[in-house]
Amino acid sequence: FLNINQLQAQNLKLDQSMGQAGLLQVQQMIGLYEDENLQKYVSKVGQRLVSKLGEQPFQYRFYVLDMAEPNAFALPAGYIFVSRGILALTNTEDELACILGHEIMHVHKRHSIQQSKKSVIPSILQIPGAVVGSVAGETIGNIIGAPASITSGLILSSYSRVHETEADELGTALAVSAGYNPKAMPAVLNRLHNEVTFIEGKNME
């Protein structure tokens, strides 16, 4: 039988392989937004949040995607993505911190790995900019399109409502611990809801 340390090492290796494979596909299919100042800003806020998590088994990395639609998502092993579209909807650093906190917690709690163990039917990688059909929920992940994908044979599925709610609550708490205003979360959620509703309306015309 494997001991705890061996199991943890296997889990970390799985996270890293899924994250690296997903990063390559995202870079190829979507592309990164080449704005050094914007990238530094997002990374600065992200690392400020990560510093409040304590010691971590991997390095968190933050990327700005060249995508006009509002979106944010995370891959295992600390790969966090935000689109230039969602950055355009954030009015303050506090709002960005709440969005990043949400995605960081998906990684920290290994939600992708947990979800992939539920025998979800795999699908071809979908560009995360595709807006989800329902915006009735109140979590970030229920408003913007979390990616349902398969990377190198490993399933990455959409998160459950329980995982989304947990990421919202813990992500906001993480933002508060880093000195950010928790009231930014409902503000940015409302703005995202309105924007996605507008996009869906345009797509139906």
Model-predicted regions and their roles:
Residues S134-T139, I144:
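Intrinsically disordered, low-complexity segments enriched in small/polar residues
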